[in-house]
Amino acid sequence: MFKKIISIVALILCVCLAFSGCDSVTTLLSGADAEVEYKIENGEAHVKTVPNKSTVTQIVIPDEYEGVPVTKIADFSAANLEYVTKIYIGKNVKEIGTWSMTNNQHITAFEVDENNPYFCDVDGVIYTKDMKTLIFYPPAKDLTDAKDGDGKDIKVSKYTISDGVEIIRSKAFYKCANLIELNIPASVKRIEEKAFFRCERMENLILPEALEFIGKDAFSYCYGLREINISANVKEIGEYAFYNCTNLKTVNVDNSESNLILGEKWFPTDNGLDIKDLKISWK
């Protein structure tokens, strides 16, 4: 009799889930089971901590928490998650910290509520609603099998950024080590701090002519890069922009050195030391 009752309850639960809206799913994934912690401040809830548990593979940031809108995903609140494969972002989130969802190596997609006026997702990638800024790329998106130079099995991915994007935000591709090919549209003007930090396999990158700014550590530890062409429109390159890009031996700059704002050791180095056969060509 007891087993029969349990079966009936389970069946009812399944039916309810099948026909329920997003609010019910939000309750299940962001409630006690997921143990998401929030901080309420000035009538708004901010995501403070997301649990790193093997039992939690999807996280939903709800529209509201305790009757107030959830408006912010704080820095480091949903970072370094080992098991999460997808994060859903509610309609009231208007601020996503640059460190908030970094180094989540198993995330295949982000999903943003279509009624969110600040952000959207395109094929699992977060952009601002106006499609001018790329916010976060999921590290495990569209992985395919491949072989590395030593014949070892690896997973790789390729991506084309949407046309019209002007800013690749800080840490947008942070530690996307499986990304081997990236197409950047002609519209991009800014690549911000640590945007491609440790994209270790990325090769044959073409920087657009319209690019004006390359941030600090933008390409640090991008071992796959071998040659970079920097257009005359670039006005500033931040410190350590190409730190530890040990295979990047050719840098062509279509400008004179005196015309640029150059951060400390902006050029390729080997753990901060000069690379002997590095060639930097100025106009």
Segments predicted by a language model, with ranges:
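The N-terminal extracellular segments of secreted preproproteins, especially immediately downstream
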Residues: L13-V15, G21, K175, R198, ...
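Sec-dependent N-terminal signal peptides of Gram-positive bacterial secreted proteins and lipoproteins
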Residues: F2-D23
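Sec-dependent signal peptide cleavage junction
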Residues: A18-A34
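Non-globular, low-complexity intrinsically disordered regions
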Residues: H46-K48
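Consensus positions within tandem repeat domains that build extended binding/scaffold surfaces
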Residues: F76, T98-S100, R169-A172, E192-F197, ...
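Structural signature of tandem-repeat unit edges
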Residues: E35-E44, S54-K72, L81-E95, N104-V125, ...
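Short, aromatic- and cysteine-enriched interfacial helices/patches
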Residues: F2, S24-L29, A78, W266-F267
